[in-house]
Amino acid sequence: MYSQQPFPPFAFNAGLIQDPANCHFGGYTGLGHPQPFSFAFSTLKSENGDSGVQGMGDCSAPVMPWNSMASFDHHGQVETNQQGNPIRAPSPTPTLSDSRIKVKEEVAHETDSGEESPEPKYPSPPNPSLYYPNTWTGSPFWQVNPTAGNNSNSTNPMPSQTLVKNGSLPGNTTYPTPANQSPNTPVDCVVSSMESSRCSSANSSNGAINERATTIPNGGMVDGGQSSDNEEEVPSESEMEQFAKDLKHKRVSMGYTQADVGYALGVLYGKMFSQTTICRFESLQLSFKNMCQLKPFLERWLVEAENNDNLQELINREQVIAQTRKRKRRTNIENIVKGTLESYFMKCSKPGAQEMVQIAKELNMDKDVVRVWFCNRRQKGKRQGMPTVDENDGEGYDVGQTMASPPVGHYSLPQVVTSQGYMAAPLGSTPPLYASAFHKNELFPQPLPHAMPMGGHIG
């Protein structure tokens, strides 16, 4: 009635593995892998004795072991190499149940004999099964390398393999194996070889550490916290006091001054000390830490002074060379420049960095010279007791102003100062006031307080 589109027959590709029970396909094997492999999974015998097969009919599938990483049973299968010759399959790995039965038999044998074994009663866990993630040859399954028996002739080393514990994930506990390790090698041999190599590497590393600890150059610390002979010990206070006395006695006997000693240290060792430092060392006025730092230099100087007769000549020659070096000349400022600086000083006695740069540019001078002049000028004003512009809140001094006395009682006679700065004749017993003769806005104004009283009470 309806035409159905024909479908191609179902066929297995090369990557599928047939089920060992052929009841599902009626005995039809289909297209399998070119290699004559058919993996038949054996049943696992439980602890109660039964085979663990629960099912009905011929199609009941065998019960698989719980271990997901267990090796396959190659019983009844034939494996061939690349040339087509049959090879021997690796021996099956003992299962967990076999190991338990073996342990029970050993325990029963020990209880029957009545003797305790020197070995621990609880045996070690069963040997882990082998798992090789990488193939040994180009084929998709394991094949024995024909040159595996002769390791010396093999040119290309095999990739490193891993040992995975039975029933655990691949990344849980892995053990690196040698590149030329064969899958037929027992697990005990592999583990023992790894333990021996690990112990040998640990012993070699410990030996290298001990060797480095015992041979430390340049006066380093040795094992046990003890210092080497090259490291100088810290002297005590009594030893430091005795050394200071000996230093002073030898220095005076050889004819050296304290300044000569400080200068000689600079000539010989590149670190010059002042005469004050040497004096304080001899009188034990330095701190103990500074004296400990200075003592090695003075000890070397004593040895050099006793053995070298030309040390005094060397010191004198160096002093002459130092005195003949060019010294910075004193800065001379012209009177016109001084007057300009005074005018700037009256405006602001402590200018900032930008103002100093501007003043230096206007006067064609160095900035440091301007800075030093302002510092000296402020110190000069402090010595003379003259108030500066900053002390008067930035106000300039103006002597050409009218100064009147405050009213005292009912009689007050104001005194007026002329614009020329000369004061009028006093009246009565009023004390005179002598003002400077400089004009307004002229240089060097006199710092006089404002509104000074000019008259007194008459009566």
From Swiss-Prot:
Q: Which domain of life is it from?
A: Eukaryota
Q: Where in the cell is it found?
A: Nucleus
**Any GO MF annotation of the entry:** sequence-specific DNA binding
Alphabetical keyword list: Activator, Developmental protein, Differentiation, DNA-binding, Homeobox, Nucleus, Transcription, Transcription regulation
Specify residue ranges for compositional bias: Basic and acidic residues. 99-112
* Disordered: annotated segments: 78-131, 216-238
Q: From start to end residue, where is composition biased (Acidic residues)?
A: 229-238
Q: Which residues bind DNA?
A: 326-385
All copies of domain POU-specific, residue ranges: 232-306
Q: How does it assemble?
A: Interacts with components of the transcription complex that assembles on the vent2-B gene, including vent2 (via C-terminus), smad1 and smad4. Forms a repression complex on the promoters of the gsc and mix2 genes via interactions with the nodal/activin signaling pathway transducers foxh1/fast1, gtf2ird1/wbscr11 and smad2. Forms a repression complex on the promoters of the nodal/nr1 and siamois genes with the maternal factors tcf7l1/tcf3 and vegt.
Name of the protein in its database record: POU domain, class 5, transcription factor 1.1
Q: Gene encoding this chain?
A: pou5f1.1
